[in-house]
């Protein structure tokens, strides 16, 4: 049973920021530290810092020949069972670093020349150079290390969707980077049928089919060697009918000196680190977050139609406020992912003196939300969202309320969502006053605007919010 069904969220995977796991069976997805490291939102940055803190501490112990201390850290990288992700068949039970192969795996890492020589720079590099480590083990190591961040994320998502938590439950060990040690704490946890569950942001999971030793070997190492053999006119050089020389990848694979193995990759990388750098840069520039369609085979057009119907069924006024808030979160998640992620509801700022309805993290690597920083010179680490399920007109107090959330450190961009307005020109003029005064950018969005963007999805237009937000910003700035 999926989380959305178990708790009657009335939301599809497209509307949820987390992977909508089936708690009875593992989903064959993996927490991907490379994707995590590529993301620019605050949650991911903090989780990546924690991951790198553990990695550096662990690897330094090995390089300094302090194997006992390294082994003590490694002991905590057991089989996590809380995420319901991975390769297990049947009920989730973990399928990675068990007691049987733990010692063998640790010895492989400790004795690896890739670790000793410094070729291994990040946790995900273990997969490229060390036998016995693949995507499932990397995913499970990462889950253990960032467990504290996943606990907090789960709490926020449960608060957002009204899912009850159990109090005073042991979190499980996580890496505390401030203290450089493993810690365990009592927390409010999601517990289902007696088992702790951690929700995972969908933007940090993948099928782990890109950052692989095979891809590095076939697309970078062998292509480099092809050029080298041609340059040196080696015995592997053949000629086409027109006399053009060439070297096949097959001949390189069959030659003893460049046959595939992780040891060979480590030796090659030590001699040619620039090729490894090129591989990492290529992955970073071509990697994209997993799409909703990869997680759920539902038709986005049907989801958009469903959201339009739901929006029309919620009456304006206080009674429908919570339903409206949650629907808005779902619609914005559906429209903006993966550029805007990790929604938090009723977030307190300024020591609780002010509250904002919803806060998203800005994770954009291009497009409108990225241009806020680069082109519009507006800090936008967070996207503030105020939802007003009013039947009356939105006026200056609501605008002042949202702009009062803005600061250089938190961001100066927000969306003001309301059901309808009688005079959009006046509302845009009020937002222009805020913009001209240097207090930030505020864009009003009404039901009809959401419906326009959702209809664009139905028509097959990619990222329909790009055109809408750009035009709405222009209407505010040039009013």
Locations of regions flagged by a protein language model:
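The feature marks a conserved, polyanion-engaging helical scaffold used by nucleic-acid processing enzymes
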Residues: 175-344, 349-352
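Generic alpha-helix signal with a bias toward terminal, lower-confidence helices
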Residues: 41-43, 150, 157, 166, ...
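Catalytic core segments in nucleotide and nucleic-acid processing enzymes
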Residues: 303-479
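Short, mixed-charge, low-aromatic patches
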Residues: 99-111, 281-290, 316-317, 354-361
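Terminal, charged accessory segments of proteins
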Residues: 1-252
């Amino acid at each position: 049973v999926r989380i959305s069904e178990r708790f009657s969220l009335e939301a599809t995977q497209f509307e949820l920021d987390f992977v909508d796991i089936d708690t009875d069976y593992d989903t064959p997805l993996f927490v991907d530290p490379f994707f995590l490291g590529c993301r620019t939102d605050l949650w991911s940055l903090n989780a990546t810092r924690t991951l790198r803190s553990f990695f550096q501490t662990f690897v330094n112990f090995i390089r300094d020949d302090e194997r006992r201390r390294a082994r003590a850290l490694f002991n905590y990288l057991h089989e996590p069972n809380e995420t319901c992700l991975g390769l297990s068949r049947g009920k989730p039970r973990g399928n990675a670093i068990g007691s049987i192969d733990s010692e063998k795996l640790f010895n492989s890492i400790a004795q690896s020349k890739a670790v000793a020589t410094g070729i291994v720079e990040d946790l995900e590099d273990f997969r490229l150079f060390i036998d016995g480590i693949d995507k499932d083990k990397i995913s499970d190591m990462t889950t253990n290390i960032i467990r504290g961040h996943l606990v907090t994320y789960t709490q926020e998502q449960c608060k957002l969707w009204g899912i009850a938590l159990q109090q005073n439950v042991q979190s499980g060990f996580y890496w505390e980077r401030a203290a450089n040690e493993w810690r365990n704490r009592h927390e409010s946890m999601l517990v289902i049928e007696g088992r702790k569950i951690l929700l995972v942001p969908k933007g940090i999971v993948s099928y782990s089919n890109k950052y692989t030793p095979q891809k590095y070997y076939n697309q970078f190492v062998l292509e480099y060697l092809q050029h080298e053999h041609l340059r040196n006119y080696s015995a592997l050089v053949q000629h086409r009918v027109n006399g053009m020389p060439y070297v096949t990848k097959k001949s390189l694979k069959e030659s003893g000196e460049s046959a595939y193995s992780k040891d060979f990759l480590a030796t090659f990388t030590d001699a040619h680190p620039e090729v490894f750098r090129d591989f990492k840069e290529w992955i970073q520039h071509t990697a994209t977050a997993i799409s909703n369609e990869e997680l759920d085979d539902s038709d986005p057009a049907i989801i958009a139609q469903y959201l339009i119907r739901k929006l029309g069924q919620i009456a304006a006024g206080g009674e429908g406020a919570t339903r409206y808030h949650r629907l808005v979160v779902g619609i914005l998640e559906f429209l903006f992912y993966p550029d805007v992620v990790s929604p938090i509801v009723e977030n307190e700022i300024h020591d609780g003196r002010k509250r904002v309805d919803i806060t998203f993290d800005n994770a954009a690597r291009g497009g409108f939300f990225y241009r806020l920083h680069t082109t519009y010179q507006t800090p936008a680490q967070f996207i503030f969202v105020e939802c007003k399920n009013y039947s009356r007109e939105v006026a200056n107090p609501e605008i002042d309320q949202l702009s009062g959330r803005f600061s250089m450190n938190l961001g100066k961009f927000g969306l003001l969502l309301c059901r309808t307005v009688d005079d959009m020109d006046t509302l845009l003029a009020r937002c222009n006053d805020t913009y001209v005064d240097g207090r930030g950018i505020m864009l009003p969005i009404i039901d009809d605007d959401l419906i326009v963007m959702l209809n664009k999805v139905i028509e097959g237009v990619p990222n329909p919010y790009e055109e809408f937000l750009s035009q709405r910003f222009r209407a505010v700035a040039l009013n």
